[in-house]
Amino acid sequence: MKVLSLLYLLTAIPGIMSDVQLQESGPGLVKPSQSLSLTCSVTGYSITSGYFWNWIRQFPGNKLEWLGFIKYDGSNGYNPSLKNRVSITRDTSENQFFLKLNSVTTEDTATYYCAGDNDHLYYFDYWGQGTTLTVSS
């Protein structure tokens, strides 16, 4: 996980990014037991042309957790610890992909990032800026 954190810092340095841009959007606040839906809009590259399109979250205290991906061909992979709660889908016409997380609790409070990687070896080539989610009643 330390390697993942370091790679995140390296890829986040201004000037390293290319013309591919990712932008997350979401509700900001969700009540416990509700579902969370987030959107990642990709510009500069078609999500059907290549890459794994991932969702990752960073908890308060900076721990990172990979949630899952949707591949360019539409196939999925998920973190086994969240497999029953998480779903990642896409809209190819809008060049967007989505995260749905069911039955949220306060433990799901985090900053959520979308990211693209070419080889799925825990190095993420492109990152969004992140969207903060708070779970609170």
Swiss-Prot record:
Region called Complementarity-determining-3, residue ranges: 117-126
UniProt KW Amino-acid biosynthesis keyword: no
UniProt-annotated stretches for the region Framework-3: 85-116
GO biological process assignments: immunoglobulin mediated immune response
GO molecular function, one term: antigen binding
Record region (Framework-4): 127-137
Region Complementarity-determining-2, annotated ranges: 69-84
Disulfide bonds: C40-C114
CDD domains: IgV_H
InterPro entries in alphabetical order: Ig-like_dom, Ig-like_dom_sf, Ig-like_fold, Ig_sub, Ig_V-set, IgHV
Gene Ontology cellular-component terms listed: extracellular region; immunoglobulin complex
Region Framework-2: start-end pairs: 55-68
Residues annotated as signal peptide: 1-18
Spans annotated as Complementarity-determining-1: 49-54
Keywords: Adaptive immunity, Disulfide bond, Immunity, Immunoglobulin, Signal
Annotated region described as Framework-1, given as residue ranges: 19-48
Comment field (misc): This alpha chain was isolated from a myeloma protein that has anti-dinitrophenyl activity.
Entry protein name: Ig heavy chain V region MOPC 315
Source organism: Mus musculus
